[in-house]
Amino acid sequence: MSAVDEQNQPNLNYFNTMPSWQHYVSRTPKEFYDWYNGVSEEVAEFEVAELIRLSGDRKVIVDTNIPLDTLYKIAEPNHVAVMLSPQSMSVASFFNRGDPEKQFLLKEIEKCSNPEAAFENFKACIASVNNPEVYEAYLHSGFFTLIRENTERDTREEVFQKLAEHFELN
């Protein structure tokens, strides 16, 4: 039995009900934005429970999309790090990473009847969830924030070092 059901978590259940992957990559930016934020809200309760379970008597570091309003309720500012990059960077570099999920989506886009239009549309979808209002909300959230503006200059090692200092892991 799954803890996710269509009635209580329609956004998390989307992948069980979507017509096709081409439909997924062809939604409007507004539909994608609403779905993405719905998923963040719906999954937060599961993520918080898992964080409590994992943390026990140790520190854990996770990459999550827990919404700010939830983070304010459950975490001290020094227990959160927000990582931001400009919208242009997040959109331009989305498919440049080699992770299998991104490459899978790229292949699904190529299967669309008009792959170029589908690609541009999906980039607009990514831009919608990385819009300036969202960026500003995270930037001014009161949480520790790292801004990555240059993939060549801002190395992983530097980012890890800044995070280690923030979380007092050194």
Write out the residue ranges for each language-model feature.
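Conserved catalytic network of the ASCE P-loop NTPase/AAA+ motor domain
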Residues: 52-55, 73-77
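Alpha-helix-centered segments that form part of catalytic cores
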Residues: 34-49, 116-140
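Conserved phosphate-donor/acceptor-positioning beta-strand/loop module used by diverse small-molecule
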Residues: 75-114
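NTP-dependent small-molecule kinase module
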Residues: 128-170
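A solvent-exposed, charged loop/short amphipathic helix patch at secondary-structure junctions
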Residues: 16-33, 98-120
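ATP-dependent small-molecule kinase phosphotransfer cores
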Residues: 2-59, 66
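Conserved nucleotide-binding/hydrolysis micro-motifs of P-loop NTPases
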Residues: 66-68, 85-91, 152-153
